[in-house]
Design a protein with these regions (language model features):
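Active-site recognition of the HExxH zinc-binding catalytic motif
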Residues: 81-100, 104-105
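Amphipathic, soluble alpha/beta structural segments
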Residues: 81-82, 86, 110, 119-126, ...
Length: 208
């Protein structure tokens, strides 16, 4: 872990730096998959990011104008991988599970420490959530082996999002967004976000 941290041990890379580096995040992954090469225009920070958090969103892609927008109120540790996710949409990738996969892969192959860390953190969260659903005890055993810095970020991220859970706006937003995804042809709706686990396992099982 080579990223800057604050006095509480939490990821403290300036969000302005993360945003400015966004145009380079796909440099590594395009060497593996050249069809992903695309003239990146970067992403935009949403002014009403706090409201995005109330709705449960970390990013949104406006296909009509080809613009990726990200929530800059939420913890910075997952901002790089969120940016990589939204930039996958710019490349014509529609399904959320595929964008989540590219969010991880592009970040960890970017060559930038702040993005690499964020990508692995996002990957752990998805894989960890899947493990927790089937074997909570195994999950906590593995989580107990994580470095203190990673644990600090997981706790900070959870504490941030806990304040917005179960509010009316988030519930309505989830219902509407789930319906929207299904109307676009994604039968799994919101569940598609967590299906990235299958892609991560399929890709990395032969590399470990």
């Amino acid at each position: 872990d080579t990223v800057p941290r604050d006095e509480n041990g939490v990821y403290a890379v300036p969000k302005e730096q993360i945003l400015s580096e966004s145009r380079s995040v796909y440099g590594g992954v395009t060497e593996l998959f050249p069809f992903l090469e695309f003239p990146d225009t970067g992403v935009k920070a949403v002014r009403c990011s706090r409201f995005m958090s109330v709705m449960g969103f970390t990013g949104v892609y406006f296909a009509c104008v080809g613009e990726s927008n990200v929530n800059v109120d939420s913890p910075a540790c997952l901002l790089p991988s969120t940016i990589a996710h939204e930039l996958a949409h710019q490349r014509g990738v529609a399904w959320e599970q595929e964008c989540n996969f590219l969010g991880v892969l592009a970040s960890v192959t970017s060559g930038m420490p702040d993005y690499i860390y964020s990508g692995w953190l996002l990957g752990f969260i998805h894989l960890g959530n899947a493990l927790y659903e089937t074997d909570p005890e195994a999950y906590w055993v593995i989580r107990g082996t994580l470095p203190a810095a990673v644990e600090a970020d997981l706790r900070d991220n959870s504490a941030y999002w806990d304040q917005f859970r179960d509010n009316v706006v988030e519930k309505v937003s989830d219902t509407v967004y789930d319906a929207a995804l299904k109307s676009y042809g994604d039968a799994n709706g919101m569940k598609s976000y967590s299906m990235v686990v299958e892609l991560l396992v399929a890709y990395y099982k032969d590399l470990i």
